C-alpha cells in the first residue's frame, strides 16, 4: 500500500493587467504530472499556446478561471482587482489545493498557504499552465469583443495601448469595455 501523500499544489497567474480594455483574467491549475513545453505564455506563439491549452485541460488534475471585470478594475484598482480574480480562480477549483504558488510579488487572501514567486510563470510548471490558460481565454474574449465593438482592433492588440488602439480611442471615444481609470482613457474622458 502506498502511504505517500501527494501535496496538491495550484499555480496561479493573470493576464490583462496592462490593457486599456477588457477584464483581467486569471487561471489556477493543479497538474497530475509535468507537461512538456510549459513556459511563460508570452514566450509562446498563439498556435503553441492553443495546443498546450488543450493538453493542460485534458491532463490537469484540476483547473479553473477567475476574472475581474472592467467595473471592478475601475472601482478597486488593477492590483486589488487582480488579487480578487486570483482568489476567484482558486476558489473555483473543484479540488482544494494544499498550497498555492502565484506568479508575481503579491498573493491573494486564501484559506491555505500561498507564496508569490517573481517570474514564476517561467519557473513553476503549474504557474506556466495557468499563464497559458488565462492568456488563451482572454485572447479569445478580446477577439469576440472585437465583433461587438468594431473599429478598435481588439482582435489584434487585445486591448493594449498600441498606436492603432489609441487612434481608435481618439476617433471613436471609449466603449463599454474600456477602463475609465486608465490613461489615455481617463484623459480622453476629462477633455
From Swiss-Prot:
This is Ribonuclease HII. Its EC number is 3.1.26.4. The keyword Zinc does not apply. NCBIfam families: PRK00015.1-3 (NF000595), PRK00015.1-4 (NF000596). Belongs to the RNase HII family. A divalent metal cation binds at residues 13-14, 103. PROSITE patterns: RNASE_H_2. It is found in: Cytoplasm. It comes from Legionella pneumophila (strain Lens). Endonuclease that specifically degrades the RNA of RNA-DNA hybrids. Manganese or magnesium. Binds 1 divalent metal ion per monomer in the absence of substrate. May bind a second metal ion after substrate binding. GO terms for cellular component: cytoplasm; ribonuclease H2 complex.
Amino acid at each position: 500500500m502506498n502511504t505517500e501523500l501527494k501535496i496538491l499544489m495550484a499555480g496561479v497567474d493573470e493576464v490583462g493587467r496592462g490593457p486599456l480594455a477588457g477584464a483581467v483574467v486569471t487561471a489556477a491549475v493543479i497538474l497530475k504530472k509535468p507537461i512538456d513545453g510549459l513556459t511563460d505564455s508570452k514566450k509562446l506563439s498563439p498556435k503553441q499556446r492553443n495546443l498546450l491549452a488543450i493538453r493542460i485541460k485534458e491532463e490537469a488534475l484540476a483547473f479553473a478561471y477567475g476574472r475581474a471585470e472592467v467595473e471592478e478594475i475601475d472601482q478597486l484598482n488593477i492590483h486589488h482587482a487582480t488579487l480578487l480574480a486570483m482568489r476567484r480562480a482558486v476558489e473555483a477549483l473543484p479540488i482544494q489545493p494544499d498550497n498555492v504558488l502565484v506568479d508575481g510579488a503579491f498573493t491573494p487572501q486564501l484559506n491555505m498557504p500561498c507564496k508569490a514567486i517573481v517570474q514564476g510563470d517561467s519557473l513553476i510548471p503549474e504557474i506556466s499552465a495557468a499563464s497559458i490558460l488565462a492568456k488563451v481565454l482572454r485572447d479569445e474574449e478580446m477577439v469576440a469583443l472585437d465583433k461587438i465593438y468594431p473599429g478598435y482592433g481588439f482582435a489584434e492588440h487585445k486591448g493594449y495601448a498600441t498606436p492603432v488602439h489609441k487612434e481608435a480611442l481618439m476617433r471613436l471615444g471609449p466603449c463599454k469595455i474600456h477602463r475609465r481609470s486608465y490613461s489615455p482613457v481617463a484623459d480622453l474622458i476629462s477633455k
